Amino acid sequence: MKISLNNKEYESGKITREKYKKFAEVYESLLGKEKTAQTFSDDDLDRMVEAIVQVFGNQFTFEEADDGLDEISSIILNFSLINAEIMNNTNIQAEETAKTLKTNIITVGGKEYESGKIGRKKYRAFREVYDDLVTPEKQTYTDDDLDRMVKAIVEIYDNQFTFKEANAELADVSQIIFNFALINANIIKRLAEQAKDAKKNLSSQV
């Protein structure tokens, strides 16, 4: 993600949990307000700018950001683009995986792991988190939400790696979201494969 301030361009790099936390807190607090109000207070705008500064790793100060984003629309737009960037990175990872069809593979610490069969026990752990977090109104995730996703990933992969190892590997928030969503994609892919194989068991058609 890029931003231009006072004729200088900056890149955010990975949007880590530390960077994301401030943004998520501000986004959630303003989301409800946005439904009932069409304006933002000075404090609201300050918090948006602070979140932008943090997402860009404090490469510029609050004052520099506030001066560079000299229109209200610029503050709101660049703040909103943070979520768009995360979704864009998630989509890029999905496109790369679609090329390889490796929906049951995750790389942790330079090593590839396969999820193996997803039975009821593993599926239950995933489903509980999925049902709580994947809803139309859910736009951001707390640290606890992200922890739950990572724990579900670890369990789906039969604890072949630890939570700590997975959390270190999935440093970008988009990586956590993507690999969690990939679990469902893998189940759907396996269903399609099994359905294709099962056709030979159907009665012959006249």
Residue positions per predicted region:
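Short, intrinsically disordered N-terminal pre-domain segments
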Residues: M1-N6
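Residue-level detection of beta-strand-connecting loop/turn positions
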Residues: N7-E9, G110-E112
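Acidic surface patches and DE-rich sequence motifs
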Residues: T107
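Short, surface-exposed, charged amphipathic helix/loop patches that serve as local interaction elements
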Residues: K14-T103, E114-V206
